[in-house]
Every structure is written in structure tokens, then in C-alpha cells.
Design a protein with these regions (language model features):
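N-terminal glycine-rich FAD/FM-binding segment characteristic of electron-transfer flavoproteins
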Residues: 1-312
Length: 312
């Protein structure tokens, strides 16, 4: 695979920089970073950028989208081949603005990127995860938002040093102002990094029955996830535990499903697990088409038996 001359990275979520650098170093000969403050500049320095550009803040409550004009002015002068962003809500909003201002092709939620005969090709899901599309980008600049857990994080070298430059703030024509920020309760789980996950679906009859699910997860040293109806319909679990096309994409070694039917929208998130074990009382449930191991049975009988056996 050939490499591009330069790839630039930006993320509104600092935790995503390691993944972005992992991809950028694979696809570009030189990698440049754009960050929002000097603390982030120091954090990404060990990832090996050629130079770090620090965005000048106009306001402590600045919204990410407002940096579009500042970043566009910078990139017009530098002529990169690719701008790589984290596929967050803010990241995709910023990418859309940059795509218009720089007349650049944009691919959101990319699951794979390749350089073929000097052209950037990016793969992404479509039709709610029913299919994948591969886009061949012909514009001089490609803007790609990278889905989480697609790339392995890059290694860090604490001895690496590079210059930093400040990017002047260019106010957008219509500035979106944030008046106040309030911290929400932090989630205690990141399922995308979990090695083992127990997922629960509509086969669970009551919220109190989550106790046995958590008990099984504890025995397996696993995290607990769920299908969309449990998180957004019943509100039995936090949104961060929802596995699916618009939720978490698993990369776990094991995914044990309890009472999950296996609709495609859910399996887009669960199919990345190395081993899938399904327990469902409906022998015709679609989940068994994805499972490496399947058991037709009532989770209210199977789960207590598993806990008993695994606790010995």
C-alpha cells in the first residue's frame, strides 16, 4: 500500500488521538496534529507528529464546529491529502463544514481506509448496517471521520519532540455560542475496550432481573451491555451500554447474549466479537445465524445454572 505525503488529525475527544495516529501513520508519510489547547499538545507529542497546531480559543465555552474557518484557513495553506477526525457528533458536524469550505469529499464513520493506486478508498456502513460501501475519493483533499475501535492505537515515544504553532481564531459567519456546560454523570464502562461482554435483550422480563445478569458477568469478569430497547425503550441501562449500529461496536474476545433476538441493527455492533455465544428460547431467532455457539433455552434457567457451575 502506497502512502500519502501528509495526513492531518483532529479530535474533539482527546482519547481518540491514539487511534487516529495509528491510522495516520499507516496512510501518511508525515502526520500533523491539530489540537484545542496546550495540554492536548503535550498529550499527543509522544505519538510522533511532525508538527502540532494549537487552535486559538475565542471562548472557554467554544463549540467544536466554530473552529471550521480556522482549520480551513490552515489547511488551504498546507495542502494535505487527508484530514482524519474522530467520528463523534461534534467531529462529524465539523467535518461537514470543512467539506463545504474546502470543496473536499467526506466519508463519515469509516470502518476501513486504503490507498489504492494513489487514490484514497474508504469503507463505511450503509442501510443501517445491512451493507458496506467503498468510496473512491477523487478530490485533492479527503476528509474522513473514523469509527471507534477501527484502528489499533499507535505506540508512544515520550522522547519525541516537535514544534508547535498557534492557529489564529477565525470567527465563523454564524457563530454557535455555548452559554453553559454541565457535566453529566460519567459512565463507568467503555464496552468498546472490554474483553468479555454479556449482552441482555428483551428476553429479560423485569429490571430487577438484571441482578442475575450482573452476577454472571462478575463470574466471567465481563462487562454488561444491552440491546437498544433495554437502554432507550425501557431505560433500564445507561445509553453507553447499548450495543448496535448507533451504539457501541464490540471488539471483545467473547460476547455472550441473553435473550437477544439478533436483529441486524444490533449485530452490527456485536459481530466484531471474536466468539459469540447465544442463549435464546426461540430456536428460530436470527442470533443463532451469527453465533459460534448457541443454546436454545430459557435464560431464567440457564443463567442461574451457569453461575452455579462457573462459581465452583
Amino acid at each position: 500500500m502506497s502512502q500519502l505525503n501528509s495526513v492531518w488529525v483532529f479530535s474533539d475527544n482527546p482519547e481518540r488521538y491514539a487511534e487516529l495516529f495509528g491510522g495516520a501513520q499507516q496512510w501518511g508519510q508525515q502526520v500533523y496534529a491539530i489540537v484545542q489547547n496546550t495540554d492536548q499538545a503535550q498529550a499527543v507529542m509522544p505519538y510522533g507528529p511532525k508538527c502540532i497546531y494549537v487552535l486559538e480559543q475565542n471562548d472557554a465555552l467554544q463549540r467544536t464546529e466554530n473552529y471550521a474557518e480556522s482549520i480551513a484557513a490552515l489547511l488551504k495553506d498546507k495542502h494535505p491529502a487527508m484530514l482524519l477526525l474522530a467520528a463523534t457528533k461534534r467531529g462529524k458536524a465539523l467535518a461537514a463544514r470543512l467539506s463545504v469550505q474546502l470543496n473536499a469529499a467526506l466519508v463519515n464513520d469509516a470502518t476501513a481506509v486504503d490507498i489504492v493506486d494513489g487514490h484514497i478508498c474508504a469503507e463505511h456502513r450503509m442501510y443501517g448496517g445491512l451493507a458496506f460501501a467503498q468510496e473512491k475519493i477523487n478530490s485533492p483533499l479527503a476528509i474522513i471521520t473514523l469509527a471507534p475501535s477501527v484502528q489499533e492505537p499507535c505506540t508512544s515515544d515520550t522522547s519525541h519532540q516537535c514544534p508547535t504553532e498557534t492557529v489564529p481564531y477565525v470567527a465563523p459567519r454564524h457563530e454557535i455560542l455555548c452559554r453553559e456546560r454541565r457535566a453529566k454523570a460519567a459512565s463507568s464502562v467503555d464496552l468498546s475496550k472490554a474483553k468479555r461482554v454479556v449482552g441482555v435483550g428483551r428476553g429479560l422480563a423485569a429490571q430487577d432481573d438484571l441482578k442475575m445478569v450482573h452476577e454472571l458477568a462478575a463470574v466471567l469478569n465481563a462487562e454488561v451491555g444491552c440491546s437498544r430497547p433495554i437502554a432507550e425503550g425501557e431505560n433500564w441501562m445507561e445509553r453507553e451500554r447499548y450495543i448496535g449500529v448507533s451504539g457501541v461496536l464490540l471488539k471483545s474476545d467473547l460476547y455472550l447474549t441473553l435473550g437477544i433476538s439478533g436483529q441486524i441493527q444490533h449485530m452490527v455492533g456485536g459481530n466484531g466479537a471474536k466468539v459469540i455465544v447465544a442463549i435464546n428460547k426461540d430456536k428460530n431467532a436470527p442470533i443463532f445465524n451469527y453465533a459460534d455457539y448457541g443454546l436454545v433455552g430459557d435464560i431464567y434457567k440457564v443463567v442461574p445454572a451457569l453461575i452455579s457451575q462457573l462459581s465452583r
